[in-house]
Design a protein with these regions (language model features):
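Class I (Rossmann-like) S-adenosyl-L-methionine-dependent methyltransferase catalytic domain
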Residues: 1-32, 37-85, 109-112, 124-176
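Short amphipathic alpha-helix with an adjacent loop that forms part of the alpha/beta core around
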Residues: 86-91
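Acidic donor-binding loop of glycosyltransferase active sites
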Residues: 94
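A conserved beta-strand element that flanks and buttresses the S-adenosyl-L-methionine
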Residues: 97
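Short catalytic micro-motifs in class I SAM-dependent methyltransferases
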Residues: 100-104
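Helix-to-beta-strand junctions that scaffold the AdoMet/dcAdoMet cofactor pocket
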Residues: 105-106, 121-122
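Short, conserved SAM-binding segment of the class I
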Residues: 112-116, 120
Length: 176
């Protein structure tokens, strides 16, 4: 774990995922199923793989290119637009990651997707977004307010927020 933490920037790992792992390592089981919503090229799932997790799932509208990962690194991947719903059972995943995805979701689909993310979460959910620092005519980051996402999740009685960093737009959630 120390080696991963020391090399997280070079490997592109989320420091917030590392903080989560460091805080809750004693509560985690290597048999947990982990879903990465908007998984990209599996960067975050590979972090969990390096720690010994094997039940890794990813969903994204784009096909990932894990060519630099070892052959034994396997992800159960579904290519799908996540705004159309997550094709998983309720509480199917002990850990759900959603890193730097929500800011690309149209507002009309955002809360439906949040409901779906929470629906498939059995224990923990980690959410990170990125502030839009300036308006661009053809920018991909859509206008949203992170504090609205936080308030929405706070309104869900079956979840508690275990860490939040409003300014950095980071959130850890646990199902109660």
């Amino acid at each position: 774990m120390t080696k991963l933490i020391n090399n997280h920037l070079r490997n592109g790992y989320s420091d917030y995922n590392l903080l989560f792992l460091k805080r809750y390592v004693d509560e985690l089981n290597l048999d947990y199923k982990i879903l990465d919503v908007g998984c990209g090229h599996y960067r975050n799932l590979y972090l969990f793989y390096q720690l010994g997790f094997k039940n890794l799932y990813g969903i994204d509208r784009l096909t990932p290119d894990p060519s630099e990962k070892p052959k034994r690194f396997k992800v159960n991947f579904i290519k799908k637009d996540i705004t159309l719903g997550l094709p998983y059972e309720d509480k199917e995943f002990e850990i759900v990651l959603c890193n730097f995805v929500l800011m690309f979701i149209p507002r009309k689909s955002l809360y439906k997707l949040l409901d779906d993310i929470l629906r498939v979460t059995e224990r923990f959910c980690i959410i990170e977004t990125q502030k839009q620092f300036y308006e661009a005519k053809k920018g991909q980051i859509l206008h949203y307010e992170f504090k609205d996402i936080v308030k929405y999740i706070e309104s869900k009685e079956e979840f508690e927020i275990i860490d939040k960093k409003i300014y950095k737009e980071k959130l850890m959630v646990r199902r109660i």
